[in-house]
């Protein structure tokens, strides 16, 4: 069976999204999917809503990381986004590093991207590109949805949320299930309690 094209929309600060990204990477590495890495913003999603104080700095810093990712996208497309997101996510979600400008700059270097990508955290003109990507994620779902959004077979879905990220045969089985569900126009939701980290 040929690899299934997938668009993976993500906010880099979301720990659940990070786990799902590791799953879809496993699926792609096995040859079952080709992934186009795209951006979305929980900051844009929550505009006009009261954000608790403990999350505000994360949302602000997430916006700065998204600018760097938008610059990476302009520089080298989906492949550059994938490399930078992997470097950012490993630092933030695996090593517990702060999501600050120094960590972003280190991730940019690790991803083999030019320093201009790290400097893009201050480029407010990139906010329009982030917003356009976010709007594409919401259009794929057809409603408002958080991160991640996975689009395949002409449909977008929030999730799947996977903790921990499945590997090997389980990763492929889950992907096949998602692919099959995407082909059922009547399907809209399936949910259970989230696993703890």
Residue ranges and their predicted role:
Residues 2-7:
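Extreme N-terminal starter segment of soluble prokaryotic enzymes
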Residues 23-27, 101-197:
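C-terminal cap of thioredoxin/glutaredoxin-like
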Residues 12, 18-105, 177-181, 189-193, ...:
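Structural alpha/beta surface segment adjacent to cysteine/selenocysteine redox centers
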